[in-house]
């Protein structure tokens, strides 16, 4: 590999793998590069640049296919070597709708292979395993046939071979906050093996991908990432790995996990998958609480995430805050996704605080912020829309409808808690998302909130928040139970 800290090797039990050539500290950027090829989901094509993935208010579309969009002429020119064949296929398939992202990525992989046929050889393909599973092989034949037909490159077997490698080695293309953008493939990162307790994580910064260490890694230690959601129970993880990647995981976490389907939470999977409405998800949460289901076990994290989204759809920031606080408090995996949750929790916490402030002081100017301090005279500090989202704050009918007012939670104590969370988030984001736009945005928001709340900064250092967090946790739970 073209990186000084790692090397590709052949390992017993693993075959191909990647090891550290030196000691690597936590939060170290091991690899930073542009992904080799990417393809946006159809829903993102018109609002996202297909080269750099930047979202612009106005994008420029390709004049020929009128489907792929770019943020600038420079990005369009840079993408042309990969778009030229895709463009032809998109025009040919227009009557049948937009080609799916996996088919468009396959066409781009063909061009990558055409430039350097040896580049795909290190990739696992598992073509024999694909052919043994009728449904998987049907997908391979269908996508390969479409790519071959619309590009008029009649090499079906080659496209099938490339599809198998794509299916096993492609990654989800996401934003730094894990919002889905599409699919991508990188010929260096695909050499990393899987673990359900990985020591590295992949972070995207637009079309740039980073491999970042999650903990200290010793020289000659193998580097691992996770191919799947590590918050899922063991039985579901093993099924997903076997179905998509054709292997079973024997990492230490899996080997030491002796839970059964009755105790690992997988029995809730069907109900979670079918619970689309907020009220059904809240009913499921009440059932989990009533049977004493462990807060750190599946499906709590996934369920509370769905509840948060449902509350946001109703513009209920108190409910969204309650769900996310319970989710974040019980999260055993302090990874990049947890950091994103903490950032969203901070933003929702500011929204909740501003709602209380709006009800207590309804005549304040819309772009001013007051936090009454017990030790300092009240001050009015101007802020901006992006920090506290002061416009159109719903009151929900009165202070007793806010989570702080309903449970008599002091606004002063809540602000101190927010400052403590912000300080910890500032340290965590530098480790999880180093040198990314996301990290800069988080740090800027934290800097602004500390400036706005500067009268509290000396107080929060010595404040014991354990009792407060217990009260807040109970309030959040009751808020959802009685919703």
From Swiss-Prot:
Annotated source species: Schizosaccharomyces pombe (strain 972 / ATCC 24843)
InterPro entries reported for this sequence: H3K4_H4K5_MeTrfase, SET_dom, SET_dom_sf, Znf_MYND
Recorded family membership: Belongs to the class V-like SAM-binding methyltransferase superfamily.
Residue positions binding Zn(2+) 1: 49, 52, 71, 75
Residues annotated for Zn(2+) 2 binding in this entry: 62, 65, 83, 87
Transmembrane region(s): none
UniProt-recorded name of the protein: SET domain and MYND-type zinc finger protein 6
Gene: set6
SET domain segment(s): 4-228
Keywords: Cytoplasm, Metal-binding, Methyltransferase, Nucleus, S-adenosyl-L-methionine, Transferase, Zinc, Zinc-finger
